[in-house]
Amino acid sequence: MTAILERRESTSLWGRFCNWITSTENRLYIGWFGVLMIPTLLTATSVFIIAFIAAPPVDIDGIREPVSGSLLYGNNIISGAIIPTSAAIGLHFYPIWEAASVDEWLYNGGPYELIVLHFLLGVACYMGREWELSFRLGMRPWIAVAYSAPVAAATAVFLIYPIGQGSFSDGMPLGISGTFNFMIVFQAEHNILMHPFHMLGVAGVFGGSLFSAMHGSLVTSSLIRETTENESANEGYKFGQEEETYNIVAAHGYFGRLIFQYASFNNSRSLHFFLAAWPVVGIWFTALGISTMAFNLNGFNFNQSVVDSQGRVINTWADIINRANLGMEVMHERNAHNFPLDLAALEVPYLNG
């Protein structure tokens, strides 16, 4: 006699909901992190689109001089941005119900806080969803670990830096030219180009691009021929095939002779781990650098560090960078400062009569 045991299906509405949320058979996996990710990212995206098109000018510096950022107020795709929350609000939590009216909320840049906080929560949940799906499929968790690098970078720019500087008005504007403005001001105030963690980030991003191009070109150049001259080489691969699609020995031999033997990986697994780890670690360091500079632990300062035997300064590139930083800083928020600090130290000429 054969007994057939079947798993008892939950008949409750909550049970069916749980099964649907955690099912890996859905076209798109939702997961418990997705329950929070979907509404937060939809909210951030919707408010961003509406504000980018139609938001009124924002008093970013808190001096009653609003700055326009939306398309309907004279901007284009390049110059448009979501203007950060006003310096008058600082780090205060500023939802719509904290303002006297919607007009006041818009004037003080409330949409920026709403978008940024929902966005950060959403991308963090996306990272958790990657881990959750990997766990349910029996995969290793490194996809979520790799994604933690851009999550850390976004958190550093949109949350940690404003906290360190004391106001959301110091956060990065959500737009193309606003991003460039943020970068220039960051250099002027923190000398980020001379910070070792930023240098590691540059090495990670550009090095990752180089290694990706090298790997892709090596693989493409050492494909195992499965097609004729008149067919695309891509037709020689069938999704899910067990056979190797390229000759790693040939790629290893080529690269080893091009540079030297030990510069080439002979293990496909360690190679792909390296390709993932290099840019991720670099971006981690950049996020850490932004987070330290948020509290004014700035880049190295070698200004006027080289002098001759008479004590006279021999200008170096560090001094050139310093002059550029001063120029950028005095142009920043020029209407907010009656006496820019870099100019206030100059002696005022005495006029007789």
UniProtKB/Swiss-Prot annotation:
Q: Which keywords describe this protein according to UniProt? A: Acetylation, Calcium, Chlorophyll, Chloroplast, Chromophore, Electron transport, Herbicide resistance, Iron, Magnesium, Manganese, Membrane, Metal-binding, Oxidoreductase, Phosphoprotein, Photosynthesis, Photosystem II, Plastid, Thylakoid, Transmembrane, Transmembrane helix, Transport
Q: Which cysteines are joined by disulfide bonds?
A: none
> Residues at site: Tyrosine radical intermediate?
161
Which ranges form a coiled coil? none
Q: Which GO terms describe its biological process?
A: photosynthetic electron transport in photosystem II; response to herbicide
The Phosphothreonine modification is found at 2
Name of the protein described by the UniProt record? Photosystem II protein D1
List the source organism: Zea mays
